[in-house]
């Protein structure tokens, strides 16, 4: 998002400070609105699937929705789900978001996500740190593409990195991945 803000600044270099602040506010408000729209779309999609999830044996409480919003401010999003739907919820959110276009710079959104699948009693702050590491890893993955891999939308796409944590608290993602490395070097 930083590159887009920088482009907006360059495009509006001739504006007075107060006018530029208004344009930046419109841009920020559009981002906030679009991310909330995508999140609502994800919730609606999950809600449609709840009866099917219950039929497949997912033990969902009748009055407890399986997604909880923790942070939804601008382009910062953090939510908690029932573990078995975490990846799908992230995929749906990113799909809904990438279909939207910002009304100020007229560009589509790209996003990366880190999905940490942990036990219910796993320390939340460690799960959050893990999801941040995973998201950073997904961003590095996208950054590794050459510019010739940029899509028609002018982006390199979206990415999700995920990890199922089995209870050991390890501070480094590469150490975690090394621990679960297969004989052929994959993880």
Across the structure, where does each feature detected by a protein language model lie?
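Charged, helix-rich terminal subdomains or tails
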Residues: 1-187
